[in-house]
UniProtKB/Swiss-Prot annotation:
Residues 44-172 form the VIT domain. PROSITE patterns: VIT (PS51468), VWFA (PS50234). This is von Willebrand factor A domain-containing protein DDB_G0292016. Residues 650-690, 777-814 have a biased composition (Low complexity). Residues 752-774 have a biased composition (Basic and acidic residues). It comes from Dictyostelium discoideum. Residues 625-814 are annotated as: Disordered. Gene3D superfamilies: von Willebrand factor, type A domain. Residues 299-467 form the VWFA domain. Residues 716-746 have a biased composition (Acidic residues). Coiled coil: none annotated.
Length: 918
């Protein structure tokens, strides 16, 4: 049963105790905050803060948080009261670290007995209005969200000695963790480090019963509402807290297990602006799926560090691990393998469907892996992978194995994080000198897992641990069908639903406009007491399509006293629109501004703005206090490097240092450098230009730096890694001749080289030019194979058709490696079977087949059972390495036996018999 693999996942993620929340995916945002700055600096950056002779001008006196939580989200009202000791007018900054799943949906400023409400404006207009108000001596407040995850509120011309009250409304998704837990996190970086009065109250209103409520870091009382079937509860502080907040506050909610999607519905009325919104959350259980029943589609991409530092035992172990990995995949998968260093190469131009031909080519590629690619440049292959559209039918899972460190690590992590909804990343850090933050950061950014391999002795076992996690049951290619109930013009967010991996929770929002068609359907549903049914479908763990009905009960489940679901639905839709601008270069500004104004949301194109005419126009010089500049900033390319290995989940403090990569600038080196290295060098050399200080609010240096990096990546993506010049065209004839000669030399080999790739190999670039393209190095060619026919296309690195047939049973002779387990796996077919002709060379007896399998056409079934028995019996201590390959074989044998209409226990009986014979 999958409970055993679930326990592996719990071990990797640190278990499911209340103190392991730091391993949850949602906590990665806070983990990065902790790495980038000290606690002292971070706590000075939160709230309203200024420096005047190193003394606080604003001091937080009172802080209350009132929160309402439902099945999937929370709405919190933060009220903070500050005293103001300034003797002059002041321009201050209010800052709050804001999680990517959170959004400020309202804010108010109260001072001089006035309550001033923030309004959403288009960002440029808000900035213009703010500057005009300041210039005329009036008060103004403007709020934006920065790229580094902070909600920034600029308060201009605050009168001296006037106390200030800030009220902020924050809507957020709940954090999710293993075992279906829901977390509401208040990180300590959200609070100043000094003492203040703190009041904390939470109301829970769930649609399903709550199993347990716990709170880490704060003493609370929990009271369930009477007659609510434990669906509603109130959480309050046990006592008055006057010492502030010293630790993270994590509210841990454990709902009862519900293996079906659950919906919540919200209605906003008034005038013509009526609408419905829904929130659907789903935490499926796959506990009843046996490992050998899992036959789900997925794309596996492996990146192997082949830099010089990997030479010796590390690269040998990596090669052996890859030998095992490629035999662990099955015919529901796509696969590709990259080797990277100063340049990179890959076995296929695009990931190929896994079959005998693919396996043979990949196997030949793996045999030639060596530590011969110079330095460690991970960005170019990652751009090559992530710039390709993902296939929803084949969830993309990337495995990175490295022993080094890279330049501009943080920028790479930020880049891959943008693909968290399309790609899951697993990372392995080898040895004591690996950049631990790179390994952890890449995996956490894309909701994967990591493994620190301190010693290479058991490297294969540790590598396979994460591959097992990637094989766990999941639901992919998820779609919501609204047409079955007749509703139209429904806006779903996110529009593309991320695969639902084991122990993950899905949350989907929608906005249903109250047009005549929809209103008629909903009214009829209410009048007849017949809920509407929509359908969620997805590809299940066994390779079949699963369908889940979702009930929308507009009569009994309708909420009309909040806009919490609307707010998050609009926020998620804005994120979709912003992503479309980034990837597809669409102009969605008008739609984003419209949604921002309607629901009060700060976005890429909107800001909060408040201006107020002062009773007494400020004539004194305004003092600007910018808490952003009270400490040396962390450089965008700064390094926080972790030394030493350790098991996954280690959370010890990591040493910080600023590191830079030394690069040769000699002409000879530049000439020899590959184009992928040129791309990386151009990328890494980017730095934000210094800006003149202005009173007006302006975009940060980080914005400029990110834009340059994005432009650099776009240069590669738009040209597909191939930027030709007139000089290149002059050499086309030579390249054609080279390609023809290569075709003749290879004959019917299993692997050609794309003509474009050959052209690239022929071209000689002027080393003085800046080249932004990424070109894979020439791929090592495997030996000829008579079992694979000559391809009919110009590129043998392009994907094979899905229907590509497996190679014939006759297999070539395989030279022994001296490692019997590897020898056996290397002659396994892609479907998991072995043939008599392949194992005869290993002198494994296959006679004494049971009567049911004694005919020649059934030989392969018995042969496969014999090999399974031999591996299980003689390599029991290496089970972690061969487990997936044997599961594939077991599945194939059981399928063949079922076709023969043999009893279900036949496999176990035959396997027991085979063990006695080997």
């Amino acid at each position: 049963m999958f409970s055993s693999i679930t326990s592996k996942l719990s071990a990797i993620s640190g278990g499911s105790s209340k103190n392991d929340y730091k391993e949850a995916n949602y906590y990665n945002y806070f983990r990065i905050l902790e790495k980038k700055q000290t606690e002292e600096i971070a706590r000075k950056r939160c709230g309203l803060y200024s420096l005047k002779n190193h003394n606080n001008v604003f001091v937080l006196k009172e802080f209350s948080i009132e929160t309402e939580i439902n099945d999937c989200s929370s709405t919190s009202i933060w009220t903070q009261s500050y005293s103001n000791d300034s003797n002059t007018p002041v321009e201050a900054k209010y800052q709050l670290p804001l999680h990517p799943t959170s959004v400020v949906s309202n804010f108010q400023i109260e001072y001089q007995g006035k309550v001033i409400q923030g309004k959403i404006k288009e960002k440029e207009k808000a900035l213009e209005k703010y500057n005009d108000a300041i210039a005329s001596g009036g008060q103004a407040f403007m709020a934006t969200k920065s790229d580094d995850g902070y909600f920034n509120l600029t308060l201009g011309n605050l009168p001296p000695k006037e106390n200030v009250k800030v009220r902020v409304v924050i809507s957020s998704e709940l954090g999710t963790h293993t075992d279906g837990q829901l977390h509401y996190c208040l990180h300590r970086y959200m609070f100043p480090s000094y003492a203040f009065n703190f009041n904390y109250n939470v109301v829970l209103k769930f649609s399903i019963p709550i199993k347990s409520i716990d709170c880490d870091g704060f003493d609370v009382n929990v009271n369930y509402k009477e007659n609510s079937s434990k669906k509603e509860a109130k959480i309050t502080s046990k006592s008055q807290h006057t010492s502030g907040v010293k630790k993270n506050i994590i509210l841990i909610i454990q709902p009862v297990e519900l293996n079906e999607p659950k919906s919540m519905i919200e209605y906003i009325g008034g005038g013509d602006d009526k609408s419905y919104a829904t929130a659907i959350n789903f935490y499926p259980s796959f506990k009843n799926v046996n490992p050998d029943e899992v036959y789900q589609k997925s794309e596996f991409i492996f990146l192997i560090d082949c830099s010089g530092s990997m030479s010796g035992q590390s690269i040998n172990k990596a090669r052996r691990a890859m030998e095992i990995i490629i035999r662990s995949l099955n015919e529901q998968h796509k696969v590709n393998i990259y080797c990277f260093g100063s340049s990179f190469n890959k076995v296929f131009d695009k990931s190929r469907v896994y079959n005998d031909e693919t396996l043979e080519i990949a196997g030949s590629f793996v045999e030639k892996i060596s530590a011969n690619l110079g330095g460690t440049e991970l960005l170019p292959p990652m751009v090559d992978i992530l710039s390709s559209p993902n296939d929803p039918e084949y969830p993309r899972q990337v495995f990175i194995l490295t022993d080094g460190e890279i330049s501009e690590r943080d920028k790479l992590i930020d880049y891959v994080a943008k693909e968290a909804n399309t790609t899951r990343i697993f990372t392995y850090g080898i040895g004591a000198s690996v950049d631990q933050e790179l390994v952890i950061g890449l995996s956490k950014a894309c909701k994967g897992y990591y493994e620190m391999i301190k010693e290479t002795t058991n490297m294969e076992k540790q590598v396979m641990k994460l591959l097992n996690v990637a094989f766990e049951p999941m639901l992919s290619n998820i779609k919501l069908d609204w047409s079955s109930c007749g509703l139209v013009d429904v806006i779903q967010a996110p529009s593309h639903i991320r695969p639902l991996f084991n122990q993950e929770r899905m949350m989907i929002y929608s906005m249903i406009p109250s047009n005549q068609t929809n209103q008629d359907i909903i009214n009829a549903s209410i009048e007849t007491s017949k809920p509407l049914i929509i359908t969620l479908t997805g590809d299940g763990p066994k390779g079949n399509v699963l369908s889940f009905p979702i009930t929308l009960d507009f009569k009994n489940d309708l909420s009309t006293n909040s806009n919490q679901i609307h707010t998050l639905a609009a926020f998620k839709h804005i994120q979709d629109l912003e992503e479309s601008e980034r990837k597809e270069k669409k102009d969605n500004k008008d739609k984003i501004v419209e949604l921002g104004k309607k629901y009060g949301l700060v976005s890429k194109h909107t800001s909060y703005i408040v201006t107020a005419d002062s009773d007494n126009v400020t004539e004194e010089t305004m003092k600007t206090v910018d808490i952003m500049n009270q400490s040396p900033p962390i450089r965008p390319g700064g390094r926080i490097v972790s030394r030493g290995g350790g098991r996954s989940g280690a959370s010890g403090a990591l040493s910080s240092s600023i590191l830079s990569r030394k690069r040769s600038s000699s002409p000879s080196t530049a000439t020899k450098r590959s184009s992928s290295s040129s791309f990386s060098s151009s990328y890494l050399s980017l730095s934000s230009s210094s800006q003149k200080k202005k009173k007006e609010v302006s975009r940060s240096d980080d914005d400029d730096d990110d834009e340059k990096i994005e432009n650099c990546v776009e240069s590669y993506e738009s040209d597909g890694g191939d930027q030709s010049s007139e000089q290149d065209e002059e050499e086309e004839d030579d390249c054609d001749d080279f390609h023809e000669d290569l075709d003749e030399d290879l004959g019917a080999t299993a692997m050609d080289v794309d003509k474009k790739e050959c052209e690239k190999e022929c071209k000689k670039k002027d080393s003085s030019k800046v080249d932004l393209k990424v070109k894979p190095s020439k791929v090592p060619l495997p030996s000829r194979s008579p079992s694979v026919s000559k391809p009919t296309t110009t590129s043998l690195l392009s994907p094979s058709p899905k229907s590509a047939p497996s190679a014939p049973s006759q297999q070539k002779s395989v030279k022994s490696t001296g490692d019997l387990l590897i020898d056996l796996l290397k002659i396994q077919k892609s479907n998991g079977s072995w043939t008599k002709s392949s194992i005869d060379q290993l002198k494994i007896p296959t006679d004494k087949a049971p009567a049911e399998l004694s005919t020649t056409e059934l030989n392969d079934i018995w042969v496969t059972i014999i090999v399974i028995a031999k591996i299980v019996k003689f390599f029991s201590s290496e089970k972690a390495q061969y487990e997936l390959a044997i599961q594939k074989s077991t599945r194939w044998v059981k399928l063949q036996l079922s076709k023969l209409n043999l009893p279900e226990n036949t496999f176990d009986k035959f396997l027991s018999n085979a063990k006695s014979l080997v």
